[in-house]
């Protein structure tokens, strides 16, 4: 989705997607899902290369036609922090920030570049919906149920925030929209922030009375 001078445009895939890069049970399940959804034989679901990655394509002025063949913009050599889904790009000063949900599934990571379509360098994790990685915390010590996360960063006034969702009730399908204040240093580094209940408020709202 983009805001094109006041006009909101929403883009979505039509499929079927071929050559998806999966292994094992994921490949088996996805091949049958695409077969049923798009009425195609599961044999059309191949293994390489595929659209499961961070890709970019330049649009013509009609905002529909691709002017060039899509290309992969994010390296797969980020270890456990490789791209999974939820691509979002922002311009911060003279750098492009690519924010995404990593393959760990519970964290928003980011990479930066001088260009919007190439040469991105992995920088780190912005937030985890279980505080995994914050001050060295391991996943076994997570402070909340971990699972699917989406979001991005935005500047409001003079401050930057990360908007994301965390899980409630221990369910991956019960999601609470949240915001945390972040700081982007002169070297474009964002230190991972913890989960709080402050949201966009700058001060603590107080403590709950004892039961």
Predicted region positions:
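Carbohydrate-active catalytic/glycan-binding domains of CAZyme proteins
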Residues: 1-211
């Amino acid at each position: 989705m983009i805001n094109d001078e006041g006009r909101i445009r929403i883009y979505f895939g039509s499929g079927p997607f071929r050559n998806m890069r999966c292994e094992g049970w994921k490949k088996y399940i996805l091949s049958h899902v695409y077969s049923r959804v798009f009425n195609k034989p599961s044999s059309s679901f191949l293994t390489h290369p595929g659209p499961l990655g961070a890709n970019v394509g330049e649009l013509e002025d009609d905002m529909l036609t691709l002017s060039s063949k899509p290309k992969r913009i994010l390296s797969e050599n980020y270890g456990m922090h490789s791209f999974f889904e939820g691509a979002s790009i922002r311009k911060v000063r003279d750098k492009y920030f690519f924010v995404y949900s990593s393959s760990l599934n519970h964290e928003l990571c980011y990479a930066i570049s001088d260009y919007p379509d190439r040469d991105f360098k992995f920088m780190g994790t912005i937030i985890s919906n279980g505080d995994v990685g914050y001050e060295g915390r391991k996943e076994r010590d997570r402070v909340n149920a971990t699972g699917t996360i989406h979001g991005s960063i935005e500047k409001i006034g003079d401050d930057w925030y990360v908007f994301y969702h965390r899980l409630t009730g221990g369910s991956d399908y019960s999601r609470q929209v949240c915001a945390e204040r972040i700081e982007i240093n002169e070297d474009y580094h964002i230190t991972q922030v913890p989960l709080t209940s402050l949201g966009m408020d700058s001060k603590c709202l107080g403590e709950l009375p004892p039961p």
